[in-house]
Each structure stands twice: as structure tokens, then as C-alpha cells.
Amino acid sequence: MAQEDDLRALGKIMDFLRAVSIILAIMNVYWYCYEAMHIWGVTIGVVDRILINFNRTGGLFHSILYTKLFSLLLLALSCLGTKGVKAEKMSWNRIWTVLVVGSCLFFLNWWILLLPISNLGNATLYIFTMTAGYICLLMGGLWMSRLLKHNLMEDVFNNENESFMQETKLMVNEYSVNLPTRFYYKKKWNKGWINVVNPFRASMVLGTPGSGKSYAIVNNYIKQQIEKGFAMYIYDYKFPDLSEIAYNHLLHHLDAYKVKPQFYVINFDDPRKSHRCNPINPAFMTDISDAYESAYTIMLNLNRSWIQKQGDFFVESPIILLAAIIWFLKIYEKGKYCTFPHAIEFLNRPYAQIFPILTFYDELANYLSPFMDAWEGGAQDQLQGQIASAKIPLSRMISPALYWVMTGDDFSLDINNPKEPKVLVVGNNPDRQNIYSAALGLYNSRIVKLINKKKQLKSSVIIDELPTIYFRGLDNLIATARSNKVAVCLGFQDFSQLTRDYGDKESKVIQNTVGNVFSGQVVGETAKTLSERFGKVLQQRQSMTINRNDKSTSISTQMDSLIPASKISNLTQGIFVGAVSDNFDERIDQKIFHAEIVVDSVKVSAEMKAYQPIPVIVEFKNEDGSDNLKETIEANYRKVKQEILTLVDSEIQRIKNTPALSHLIPDK
């Protein structure tokens, strides 16, 4: 009740001020249009004397503007205390329009009194313009009281609530990767840093094609880690994009290494620009389980659907058979023929020759007992099916160029050997992905085993477009390599792609064990998963209720997604969200980021123009200078086949000469 009385009293005061304002405006008209007033007969003697006294003592009418200014002041005060009904469509444009028009009519009409017309004409025009101006000013003032002070629709995408302070301090250590950023906070763009102070906790870079993964992040990983003396293994899906960056950056930063590193390339497309390396080098295989790992990697890369069927009979059988062949080649004459091409050629011999040879060795007899039972039991169809499961996919890999690269021994795969550090790039080709990925997967699996050891040089494994290759043991590498100073950086498009090619279980392990996450634009379940990973933050909510007589505003807070899935689904190229991990002695308070990664495009373009192509490694020339590439690799191809034929013939002959096993050789 008291509040209503107060409002009623306030209303009376405002009405009084408005009335005084109107009286002052009338006094202005009465004084400056006095002759017309006299003609109209509205002059009053008492009023005349009062106005003359006001003018004599206060100079009220010394200027035509004085009374107008006082009138406007009182009008403004009356409007200020008026509580109007809020209107959502009321805008400042409308208000400013009527205020400007009203001010012009109210203040700038003095010249009308000087027009060379009758006094009545002057007075009529003056009164009309002043009245119209006053009404416009009154409307503008009242509309201001009806204007909504807070437009809830100014931030329709909730950018202000979802922007947050990010890391602005540069944190550098001997392993860190540091990316400059620009982020939006409190209605302005700020400079910041993404500090990956512990790359050994693994990093993954997600984003749809064209989101800027390689340009903004992967390229920077390669450059900065070379600058800090990392040994590197780079899987270059679109060879030579990453390879040229690594090669040229290494040329300019050899001084970052205590021992000068060597640059090696595996490239099946062009043997001239490829080193040769045997991924199943017998020197690095100590147990038959190593042979099994190699066979497992090859077969699952050739048959991606088998990843979901691990443990099935027709999946394990060809893997075990290939593993036995690899181990046989390892123990035969101290690994003289222990290469993958030799294993393929051996597998393609008739099974009547394969099994007697393999079972001649005690350490393989038990390993192959299921095959021997099927053979001796007359289950020829089953046996042929098992062998065909291995032969058919491996036959796709029979290629002179591939045989050439995989039978040489230019270098070993222990890339982080402190005495012989290496930067190794392996190139794939999207057009031959299914064939090359299997061979390159073999290099991957061997490297994982060799680099994940104590007392080695700090190293980095960078895999671009991870789902295009099956990386056996990747989940274990991420989980255990931190203490061995192995940094892993994985690039792929989204989690569904990873799940499709690696299976649900392995995909989940990779997702949940990676410590540093970068994501460009991704959609669907991937965006939702990332949004949940980034967590929630306390956000302010404001609601407004407008009725005929009043407006009420309520402000509340609630926990909501810091970076919602909808934002992640619509990120601009070059803008990334993510989170980084820190160290005990290098705490990062704000690990989450949502920022544009700043890349000096002019500098990068200049660097790329100055890049040298990867040089020719092997010159395939005859004495007369003519090219003999085809002849050389074909000769190597025939040599591999002939070596296996010779091996098989000698072993069969030896078995025939062994009475205990001669029964395994069927009589012709």
C-alpha cells in the first residue's frame, strides 16, 4: 500500500514539473508575441507586471532561449520520473528522430518572428512550430521511459556467456610446442598461447577436411620438434606434403642435435626417392611373438574388417601361418632371406611344400599343429581355405617396386638411437592406399617396439590421417611411452572414422588416453563427446516479463556447456577448440581453449617457395647414362622369387633325406 502511495506522489510531482514546463513555454510565447496577444485581447496587466519584474531581476527574457531551456529541463525531469509501459519494438532510432525534429522546431524557430509579414502571421507560425516541437520532445522523453534497457536478443548465439579467459602467458620448455592464438573475450579479441608443455601425453588433432589441421597444427608440431632436436617418424598420407616440410626444416636446424641426424624416406611410388629398409630385420626379432605382431599388422591392414573379428578362427589362422613363415625365414641361415617379399613368395608355394618345411623345425611344429592335423586328417578343403585367406590379400602386395624397397637395408628403424638419430618419413598414396598401408603398417609396428625403450633420444611419432593405416600397438604406445620421451601426434577427421577402422574398443582407448586435444569443425557424436570433455561452466541467465503496467527482470545462474556441440559443429577454418595437459612444475590454470591459431601466412608462403624438393637418393643409370630403373627393380623381383625357389628345393631335398619326416612328402 505504501509503495502505491509513493508512486502516486511521484506521479503528482512529475505532473507538476510538466505543468511548470508548459507555463514557461507559454510565457515565452506571451513575451515575444505580445503585439499579437494584444490584438487577440489576451493580455493581462498583472501578468505583464510579473513578467517585467522577472526580466528585470533575473534577465529571464534577455534571450529567447532562456525560457525554452528551462522549459526543456523541467520537461526532461518530468519524463525521467515517468514509468512508461515497456515496448519491445521501441528503438533508439525512433527516439532520436523525434528528439531531433522537436529540438529544431522548438529552438530554431526564432527567425519566424523576423519574417516581413504581419504580427498575427508571425505569431501564428511561431506558436505552431513551438507547440509541435514541444510535443515531439515530450514524445521522445516518454518513449525513452518505454525503452527496454537490456535487449536480450543482442547476443542470440550466447557468445558472451560462452567466451572465457584463456592462457595468455607463453610457457616454453625443452619439449613444448607453443601455438600463438587470438581469442574472443569480453567483446574484444585478445592474444594468447596454446602451450603443449607435455607432448609425451599424446596429442590428437581432429577436424573435417579443410578445417586447417595440418596447416595450423601438424606442420607446427613438425617444425618445433625438429627445432628442439627430436628424432621423428612421420606418416605422410599425401606424400610429399609433410615430408618436404620436415626435410627443409631439418636442413636449417641440424644444430639442434648433438649428433647429426639422418633423413630417410620410404616411398613405394618412386624408388629413386626412396631408401630401402627391411621392416622384419632379423636382428630386431628376438621371439616368435615379434613375427606374430608383424603378421598381425599386415593381415589386419589388408583386411580392415578383420579388426572387428579378432580371435575368430578364419582370422587367426592366416595370421599364424604368416607368422610361422616369417619366423622360419628368421631362423633359416641366420635370417639370410628374412624379408617381407620373401615371406610372400614362400607363402605362394604349394602347401605340400610349405608345411613339411615349416614342421621340420621343432619351434614351429607346435605352432602349426592345427594345420598339420587338418592336412594329415584329410581336411584339404579347410586347409585350402585357411591358406587362401592369407594368400589372396597378400597377392595384392606383389609389386617389383615394393619388393625393391622392402628387401634393402639402408638403415634400421631404431630412429631414437642416441648414436644414430633419424628423421624418417613414410609416404602413402591415396590412390594405392589399400596396398601401401599394409606395408607401411609393418614399419609402424616395428618402430613402436623399437622406440619405446629407456635411455633413448626424445622422439616424436606423427601420424596424419590415422584411419588410413592400421597402427598395431598404438593404444599401448600412448599409454606407456610418456616415460620414454615418445611424443605421439595423431591426425584424423572424427571419432566415428576412427571407430570404423580401429573398432570400438581400441578407438575408445585412444580417445580416452590422449592428453592434448585439438579440434576444428566436427559434427554429430564427436562434437557432443568433445563438448562433454570440456565440461560445464556457471553461466548467467536473464529473463524479462512485460505486462500492461509493469516489467520484471530476473537473473539466475546455471551450469551449462563451456563449448556446446553446436559451436564445435560450426567452427571457422583455422579456429580450434581443445584442451592441453600440464606438468607438476608447470601448472596451466586454464587448459581449455577456443581460439584462432595464428599462422603467419606470408612467412609460410615465403618458406614454401624456398623449399628444396627431396633429392634423388638412388640413381638408376647404366654406364652410358640411360635409365635402368625398371630393369633393376625387375631383376630384384626375379631374384627374390628365385631365392625362394632355391630355398624350397633345398629344404624339400633335405626332408626327403630325413627318414623320420620323409613321409610328409607325398609320392608323385
Question: Where do the PLM segments sit?
Answer:
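Basic- and hydrophobic-enriched, low-structure N-terminal and domain-boundary segments
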Residues: M1-S211, Y215, N220, N547-R548, ...
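P-loop NTPase motor domains
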Residues: A25, V42, K149-M153, I194-V486, ...
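Hydrophobic alpha-helical segments involved in membrane association or supramolecular assembly
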Residues: L75-K83, G441, S445, N516, ...
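Glycine-centered small-residue hotspots that permit tight backbone geometry or close packing
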Residues: A132-Y134, P467, G574
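Ordered hydrophobic segments in well-structured contexts
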Residues: S176-N178, V425, I575-A579, I592-H594
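Intrinsic-disorder/low-complexity loop/linker signature
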Residues: K187, K191, D550-K551, S601, ...
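Conserved ATP-driven motor cores of ASCE-family P-loop NTPases powering translocation/secretion/packaging/pilus
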Residues: I478-T480, N484-S581
